[in-house]
Amino acid sequence: MAAARAVARDPGAYARQPPSLRAARLPRLLFLLAVVAAVGPREGGGARLYREGSDAVWLLDSGSVRSATGNSSAAWLVQFHSSWCGHCIGYAPTWRALAADVRDWAAAIRVAALDCAEEKNQDVCRTYDIHFYPTFRYFKAFTKEFTTGENFKGPDRELRTVRQTMIDFLQNHTEGTWPPACPPLDPIQSSDILSFMDSHSGQYHAIVFESNGSYVGREVILDLIPYENIMVSRALDTDKAFLGTLGITSVPSCYLIYPNGSHGLVNVAKPLRSFFSSHLKSLPDVRKKSLFLPEKSNKEEKSEVVVWKEFDRAKLYTADLESGLHYLLRVELAAHRSLAGAQLKTFRDFVTVVAKLFPGRPAVKKLLETLQEWLANLPLDKIPYNAILDLVNNKMQISGIFLTSHVKWVGCQGSRLELRGYPCSLWKLFHTLTVQASTHPEALAGTGFEGHPQAVLQAIRRYIRTFFGCKECGEHFEEMAKESMDSVKTPDQAVLWLWRKHNMVNSRLAGHLSEDPKFPKVPWPTPDLCPACHEEIKGLDSWNEGQVLLFLKQHYSRDNLVDAYSVDQGSPGEWEAQGREQEEGKGLNPSGKSWRHHDTGSLRPPHILGPRTDLSKSLHHRLDLRLQSPQGPQALKEAKAVVPFLGVGFSSLDMSLCVVLYVASSLFLMIMYFFFRVRSKRWKVRLYHPAV
């Protein structure tokens, strides 16, 4: 087991062992790794930023967010985040600390998180209009109608600020939506306090005196929600004479009425919320009560084991570029229900640049070119995202186009699943585009971008500003672009500009929680990759930018692309994985439909699918399986709708519409023919012969 852990901790250690030793240990290591994978959790192996059991954060997903926030007896504060977003990774400790800090408030308001990076959650994130990460939404208690929530409004996202805005949000509840477990948060009057002193209720009653802008009293009230035999209220320091009779000389102060009717000041070392709450919780007979909360798992979920792929850092891997395109087109873009106006133009320009300059495999390049031509010729100002998805998924079964349907990081893999990945692949794609524009400027001929050295950079800039999920990352890139992008005058300068800015980002993020310890963010290329790129001037390490440019053009060239680990168009693993996902219900949106085309074979070019009769048999086989399901007749209707007509890929509904359109067009032409025939008789010139 120790050997297996060592391999998992240092993937390169096994490769450094002598061949004879590796051969001797290989069977035992493979067995141990299989056992470890079966056992489950691996330290730091999970891609989620928050974990059931170990964190106080309530974890939601596409199947639970509506039921949790809809008509709930408590309010909710939900963070919609992405596990690859650097800012989300950096903010995760604050969110965990907040959830732990207000754990006792759960009967009134709960702190939750939903990961939009998971493909199964992409539809629900689009439904809630989540375009950037992290996004914070409040949901009121007892909300019967569907709502996307209220946006967080605060000067910053520090723990104290968010905690105080949670209190403000609670106080905005009306009487009909007030969480029943939440005590009153408004201040009481001096007369109320006097009546409490005379009532002898048989339980403790604490009153926190504070200034008008203080939150200490309300925080203590919420801290004591789960405790019985005590009641907490707050009062303002406006009645100075009354405070003097109670012996209160400063605020905040806590005054306690005991069950026997006696009363006096609470003596604590510091007038802080934690001191007041701790003292009140420790009083005799004050104990936690049973609260009926939704079931929350205390079991730590199993994490996926990272399967390491050996790779050469001097190479560029097709799998990284294609996985990035898959995530961009099928997940990130899915946050937008439709594209119109400036958004559509930004996407159209970006796709044009990628389609013309992408140096990858022909099937992927053809898909991008097909998408670009379709967008360019589309006479619409607004298009739904699903139309783009249908083309990317090759719903019309166009021959020879393909894009992998899942991510497989190689040069962008991280030591943990949430590290590197998509942001790394985007950087590689952007560098590749600038290099290809410099080395093959003729590729942009006829696009309107030819002769514009900033064209690629501007397309990248607008894409990041409009679509990239990490809002803070996009803002930083926009700042860099405003600062110096206008200085780019040649395609070579564009290559170097992006390289410099990438190194600036690495320098800023060095030591950040999003940094992978196995891939430290250091100036790139490192001396071992490009010795000629580094030189010493007056004792300082400096860049030889001429050599850097040569290195970048070589590194991001087509000749340096490696297809190892890339999914083949006819790869059984690709389609077996999709079949398993369909059977197990993985990757489904809340409505139960897969994000892929119903016919998984439609992702494969027809010449790989085999004869059309095989396709029809496959569809009818799936139809038979669905007829055996509980859905019965409804499944029959749905399945019939996707059976190709005459093997062309059109459904029966499509063909019915075509027939109706054909008949209507014929009738229209016939009517127009007879109309003009009659009119033409009136237009004929009649010749009259003069009478003699």
Swiss-Prot record:
A GO term for molecular function: flavin-dependent sulfhydryl oxidase activity
Biased composition (Basic and acidic residues): 577-586
SUPFAM superfamilies assigned: FAD-dependent thiol oxidase, Thioredoxin-like
Alphabetized UniProt keyword annotations: Disulfide bond, FAD, Flavoprotein, Glycoprotein, Membrane, Oxidoreductase, Signal, Transmembrane, Transmembrane helix
Transmembrane helix listed as a keyword: yes
Binding site for FAD: 420, 427, 431, 472, 476, 499-506, 521, 524
Gene3D superfamilies, per the entry: ERV/ALR sulfhydryl oxidase domain, Glutaredoxin, QSOX sulfhydryl oxidase domain
Domain ERV/ALR sulfhydryl oxidase positions: 415-524
Sites carrying sugar chains: N71, N172, N212, N260
CC annotations in GO: Golgi apparatus; membrane; nucleoplasm
All residue ranges annotated as the Thioredoxin domain in the record: 54-172
Region (Disordered): 568-607
Residue numbers annotated as active site: C85 (nucleophile), C88 (nucleophile)
Signal peptide, first to last residue: 1-38
Cofactor note as given: Binds 1 FAD per subunit.
TM annotation in the entry: 656-676
EC number from the UniProt entry: 1.8.3.2
Cofactor annotation: FAD
Catalytic activities: 2 R'C(R)SH + O2 = R'C(R)S-S(R)CR' + H2O2
Subcellular compartments: Membrane
Similarity-based family: Belongs to the quiescin-sulfhydryl oxidase (QSOX) family.
Summary of the function given for this chain in its UniProt record: Catalyzes the oxidation of sulfhydryl groups in peptide and protein thiols to disulfides with the reduction of oxygen to hydrogen peroxide. May contribute to disulfide bond formation in a variety of secreted proteins.
Name the record gives this protein: Sulfhydryl oxidase 2
Organism: Mus musculus (Mouse)
